[in-house]
């Protein structure tokens, strides 16, 4: 892809995100208004009332798909779920636990919560999270394979351990990942501010979209090789500006970094 094509690509991404967000906002407002007229107060969330459900500990797959609820993953003594949103539906199918939000109200002003408690010593096989306009807060998560599809809300993830592979599709909000160890990361940062502080092992692909990105790599610089390509954006590694089609380092952990529109700052935290 030529530099001009990359410029067009990233401007198109930014414009598309803006148009999609505007259209969804208008549709959601209209549907919410109609729903309130016909349903009265039925759309209200049961505030301050958490429904606690304990789940069998043999879960190894977690699938979450919500549109407006805030997602919180916390450490607990057993695997369980809390929610104050009556439109949250959940079911266990063997070793898979699936959570969905039945009502599509992307701009729910009630700030409903979906809280998942996971024992600190539990490592799940697969976790998939598909979020809408709500926030995501993760205190600790250990998983072999991770798939995150982020929406418009802010994301704060701490103590993330991914042993096999991780796919993260960034949205339009601010995303912060810290104190983490990730193998074979495929990251599309989306639009907005993205910050990650982690040991990134194996072969990884980081695609920076529009905005500011800070990548703090844990470990020595000799452990990494970074292949840089860029369009309009700027890339700096350990304080040095990097040209297009540059290769930094010769380590075992390889990162293909594609910078779009904005800036990418890479630091090594030894």
Outline where the language-model segments fall.
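N-terminal Lys/Arg-rich, disordered targeting/topogenic segments
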Residues: 1-7
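Short amphipathic alpha-helical "recognition" segments used for binding
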Residues: 7-13, 96, 143, 182, ...
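Hydrophobic membrane-insertion alpha-helices, especially the h-region
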Residues: 10-28
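Short linear S-[DN]-x-LW-Φ motif typified by the pepsin-like aspartic protease active-site region
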Residues: 29-130, 135-147, 156, 215-219, ...
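Short, surface-exposed interaction patches in beta-rich subdomains
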Residues: 157-160, 164-170, 174-270
């Amino acid at each position: 892809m030529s530099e001009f094509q990359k410029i067009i690509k990233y401007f198109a991404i930014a414009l598309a995100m803006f148009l999609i967000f505007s259209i969804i906002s208008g549709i959601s407002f209209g549907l919410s208004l109609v729903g309130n007229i016909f349903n009265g107060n039925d759309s209200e969330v049961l505030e301050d009332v958490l429904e606690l459900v304990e789940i069998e500990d043999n879960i190894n797959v977690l699938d979450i798909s919500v549109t407006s609820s805030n997602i919180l993953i916390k450490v607990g003594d057993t695997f369980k779920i809390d929610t104050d949103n009556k439109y949250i539906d959940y079911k266990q199918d063997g070793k898979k636990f699936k959570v969905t939000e039945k009502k599509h109200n992307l701009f729910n002003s009630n700030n409903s919560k979906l809280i998942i408690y996971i024992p600190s010593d539990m490592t799940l096989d697969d976790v998939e999270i598909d979020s809408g306009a709500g926030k995501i807060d993760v205190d600790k998560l250990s998983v072999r394979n991770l798939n995150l599809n982020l929406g418009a809300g802010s994301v704060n993830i701490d103590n993330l351990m991914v042993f096999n592979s991780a796919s993260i599709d960034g949205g339009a909000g601010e995303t912060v990942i810290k104190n983490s160890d990730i193998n074979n990361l495929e990251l599309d940062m989306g639009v907005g501010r993205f910050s990650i502080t982690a040991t990134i092992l194996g072969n990884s692909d980081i695609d920076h979209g529009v905005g500011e990105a800070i990548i703090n790599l844990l470990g020595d610089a000799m452990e990494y090789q970074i292949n840089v390509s860029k369009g309009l954006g700027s890339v700096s590694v350990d304080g040095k500006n990097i040209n297009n089609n540059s290769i930094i380092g010769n380590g075992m952990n390889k990162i293909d970094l594609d910078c779009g529109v904005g800036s990418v700052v890479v630091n090594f935290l030894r």
